[in-house]
Amino acid sequence: MLYLDANATEPLRPAAQQAALAAMRAAGNPSSTHSAGRAARHLLESARESLAAHFHHRPQDIVFTSGATEANALAIHALGASRPMIIGATEHDAVRAAAPGAAILPVLEDGTADLDALAGLLAVQPGALVCLMAANNETGVLNDIAAAAGICAAHGALLHVDAAQSAPRLNFDWRTVGAASVAISGHKAGGPMGAGALMLAPAYAEGLAPLQKGGGQ
């Protein structure tokens, strides 16, 4: 079969499959101090460090999730709870569903976010959480994330970026993004389904409010 839908879900790469199988064979609670727990912790933190190195970020500021949907929801829950919300008109349903009362940022004729309109919305709602995808999952349109981040910073707003579509295909470098948080997904990059991460600016990683409360691990 000739598979032509990799931008929706990329087939599992052999290296990712081998890594996943190796992790599944590790029986241990990463929070335990016995040998099996330490081995599991090593696997977990090695993966975090590898991801951080790839995106030029700090390992301690990366939270693993079940995918970009959860990463987007976590960012909106944790960063937007006490802020007005602004989301792009063409955002993924995962963002739209997590922020039902958000103001809508229109797009231009070419499908990119209207950054003049963003400045206007932030003049009325300073300090908002703005959610903007780096690359549209249906059209492939690329937004100017750096410019959007600059506008947000000028108005005391935070920017959350859904990079599920762009991170595997473009040279995505955390140092040039200027966002408070970025969501990524494993299955868009040849990884297993059910794997993703939320990358956070250091100021927002510590004390992140969880979606679900439970044990410390």
Q: Which sequence ranges carry the predicted segments?
A:
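Pyridoxal 5′-phosphate
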Residues: 1-217
